[in-house]
């Protein structure tokens, strides 16, 4: 599990704009199932935010 402020690389993401990019987690939410976490990652360009799950993130 990651936390707000963590530096990450986005991997295996279906959106080409996000895949392979680096950024910082700016917010997170827990899904209704109580197990899945959704992370908003602001890319280093400070213009783009990508929605990701655990499997799509890797610690920098």
Per-segment meaning from a language model:
Residues 2-60:
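Basic/aromatic-rich interaction segments and small domains that mediate binding to polyanionic partners
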